[in-house]
Regions:
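Residue-level marker for well-ordered alpha-helical positions
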Residues: 19, 40, 69, 104-105
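Short amphipathic alpha-helical segments and helix-helix/interface helices
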Residues: 22, 72-73, 108, 112
Length: 115
């Protein structure tokens, strides 16, 4: 059985750093965290819902925009076993007037742990 829990799904408040997306996908023997949103909202929502974000088998990034990745700085990296992302996920992104990319400290944390 597969259980999918939406941890954060906010599309309207990008300017206020509240936008983003994150889901937790669990089966009997695998836990996948898909995207980590922008802020600590996934941590707050997981606490409210009594959802355990430890022992993540796979962290999957859909793409490298900060509204899907920046919440990583609130995640305990020792709880993540593997990261799956397209290599271009870590390259700078442009969208209109916003400069969207992994902030240097987030990218450093990922590369230090997994590369």
């Amino acid at each position: 059985m597969v259980n999918i829990t939406v941890l954060h799904n906010e599309l309207e408040n990008f300017i206020e750093e509240k936008s983003g997306f994150s889901v937790l996908i669990k089966s009997d023997n695998v836990k996948i965290l898909f995207d980590v949103s922008y802020s600590d909202d996934i941590i707050q929502n997981s606490k409210k819902g009594n959802i355990d974000l430890s022992n993540i088998d796979y962290l999957v990034f859909s793409h490298g925009h900060i509204d899907h990745t920046e919440g990583l700085k609130f995640i305990n990296l020792s709880d993540i076993k593997n990261v799956l992302a397209h290599p271009d996920c870590f390259q700078k992104k442009y969208f209109r007037l916003f400069f969207l990319f992994f902030k240097p400290e987030t990218a450093t944390a990922i590369f230090t742990k997994f590369c």
